Amino acid sequence: ATRMLVSELAGKASLAAKAKSLGIDLSGDARTLQAILDDVKTREAHGYSYEVADGSLAVLIRRHLGLYEPHFRLESFRVIVDDREDTGALAKDAASEATVKIHVGDRRIVAAGEGTGPVGALDAALRMAITEYLPQVANMELTDYKVRILDEEGAGTSATTRVIITTSDKRGSWGTVGVSENIIEASWNALVDSIEYGLIRAEG
């Protein structure tokens, strides 16, 4: 494989260059740069992959710099996967229904949505909840998602799942990543990064 992990490239210099391409200058802060690099390495060891997840990497860097202010906060979510055709509870293409409870500022919103697979259902429910308050979300479209089971052999239901989401707006597209033993949680984490980064792009 010619593709290398971000952490295996030229270390700090590579990460600083990547951050610069995302509009973030890390050149004058060696300590923070090292902390971010260590975080990336740790996450990659747990299954994260940032080569096609610029959105998640940008959010991660902003967290370290104290520049990340979430636009919404999750209270809880619930996803029901239609298993009538014996597709398996983790089937990414099974008809699904999601309900989310979200806080935007001091508002609490409960919304439901339907979609193909847990990602589609969560995306529909989240948009239903927040678009009225964050209208830029209407310009974003979930264009692709990939689910990969990591360490599959012998892991059974505890196998780690990586979800990569591609989202687009009028100016381009970006990828985000979520990793968890629970496909729903991995999907949610990737989805939140995708919306948050899209809002950061819209504001920038």
PLM regions and their residue ranges:
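Terminal or standalone catalytic/regulatory effector modules within metabolic enzymes
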Residues: 1-204
